[in-house]
């Protein structure tokens, strides 16, 4: 997992600033190690209203400022602690949202898959996007939970015998293995319905217009223009020799990226983001959504079932077209790095400290091992 050292970023920017003052009134630097390629740091040399009269005075003033920066560096971003804290909050909210009640069987089935663990990447992205545009956790937590409920529904249905026929998910037997196909289908249906109820009823301190907009975004992300579209084309493409890169991208943008995109966009809308901010984050999310699937394809052929917590090599067995199958492992990895870079470029112009979680999440998705 990668993290962003904001302290090093700010300190290096400062040193570059000082080095250029004696050479030019205005220069622009693009930091070579900075993942935000399009974020150029412009150092404008402004005339002081009270000019310093000597070179020694300038040096003394700069040394004092540099010493102050070194003594009080901005804290680096701790991605592991961030995900642990967000994960705990999300798990508590999910636990409270769906208590064990009658009818017991359906609630047991819903909770079995929903609370089985998982990386909680989608709800974390929702919360991070909300905070990036000036909101807080409480404004987006119901939406974050709703996204995780819908994601869980998609996994339950995806594992069914009529779909991928899988028996392992998150290191445990799949829902239909434990509760039967009939209850598994109904558990997925119930999670889907309750997700929208939860956003509508539990979202507080957000205007009704923004809540309605968020509901519309989420519905579009998972319907016939989103997740379902990707799943249908994926099923129809099994065993086909006519699946090219364009069709594969369509499958994964819809089947995987659309829900990740929805998570980020919901957070931005509910947090009070402007239309411009929402669209930048939409593009960021689409890139990391496709990135997630490219990495998933790579892991499917390079890791074991034990390492993944789900059945490895199942796409190969089902004769599905994947990025490694079309591009090879190394070219797939290069494509993943390209998507990661392009995603992070969309965060240029946002507060770097607030953008740090989204940068780190993109790096995590790119370099995850399961």
Swiss-Prot record:
Pfam families: polyprenyl_synt. Residues 1-42 form a transit peptide. It is found in: Plastid, Chloroplast. Its EC number is 2.5.1.-, 2.5.1.1, 2.5.1.29, 2.5.1.10. It is an enzyme of class 2 (transferase). Its cofactor is Mg(2+). Mg(2+) 2 binds at residues 158, 164. GO terms for biological process: carotenoid biosynthetic process; farnesyl diphosphate biosynthetic process; geranyl diphosphate biosynthetic process; geranylgeranyl diphosphate biosynthetic process. Keywords: Carotenoid biosynthesis, Chloroplast, Isoprene biosynthesis, Magnesium, Metal-binding, Plastid, Transferase, Transit peptide. Optimum pH is 8.5. Its main location: plastid. Mg(2+) 1 binds at residues 158, 164. NCBIfam families: FPPsyn (NF045485). This is Geranylgeranyl pyrophosphate synthase, chloroplastic. It comes from Hevea brasiliensis (Para rubber tree). The lineage of its organism: Eukaryota, Viridiplantae, Streptophyta, Embryophyta, Tracheophyta.
């Amino acid at each position: 997992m990668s993290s962003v050292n904001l302290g090093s970023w700010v300190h290096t920017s400062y040193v570059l600033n000082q080095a250029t003052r004696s050479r030019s009134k205005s220069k622009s630097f693009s930091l070579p190690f900075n993942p935000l390629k399009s974020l150029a740091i412009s150092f404008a040399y402004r005339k002081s209203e009270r000019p310093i009269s000597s070179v020694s005075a300038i040096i003394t003033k700069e040394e004092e400022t540099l010493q102050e920066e070194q003594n009080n560096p901005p804290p680096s971003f701790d991605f592991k602690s961030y995900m642990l804290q967000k994960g705990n909050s999300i798990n508590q909210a999910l636990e409270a949202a769906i208590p064990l009640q009658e009818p017991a069987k359906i609630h047991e089935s819903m909770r079995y898959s929903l609370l089985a663990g998982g990386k909680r990447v989608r709800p974390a992205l929702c919360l991070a996007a909300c905070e990036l545009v000036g909101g807080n956790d409480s404004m987006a937590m119901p939406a974050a939970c709703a996204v995780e409920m819908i994601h869980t529904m998609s996994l339950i249905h995806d594992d069914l015998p009529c779909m991928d026929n899988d028996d392992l998910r998150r290191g445990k037997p799949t829902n239909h293995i434990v509760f039967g196909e009939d209850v598994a289908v109904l558990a997925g249906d119930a999670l889907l319905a309750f997700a929208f109820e939860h956003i509508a009823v539990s979202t507080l301190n957000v205007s009704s217009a923004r809540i309605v907009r968020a509901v519309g975004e989420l519905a579009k992300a998972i319907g016939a223009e989103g997740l379902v579209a990707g799943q249908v084309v994926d099923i129809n493409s099994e065993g086909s020799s006519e699946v090219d890169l364009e069709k594969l991208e369509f499958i994964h943008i819809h089947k995987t990226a659309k829900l990740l995109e929805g998570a980020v966009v919901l957070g931005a809308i509910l947090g009070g983001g402007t239309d411009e901010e929402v669209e930048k984050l939409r593009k960021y999310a689409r890139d990391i959504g496709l990135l997630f699937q490219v990495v998933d394809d790579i892991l499917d052929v390079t890791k074991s079932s034990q390492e993944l917590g789900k059945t490895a090599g199942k796409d190969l067995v089902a004769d599905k077209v994947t990025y490694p199958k079309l591009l090879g492992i190394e070219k797939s990895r290069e494509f993943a790095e390209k998507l990661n870079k392009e995603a992070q470029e969309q965060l240029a112009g946002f507060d770097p400290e607030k953008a740090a979680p989204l940068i780190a999440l993109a790096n995590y998705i790119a370099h995850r091992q399961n």
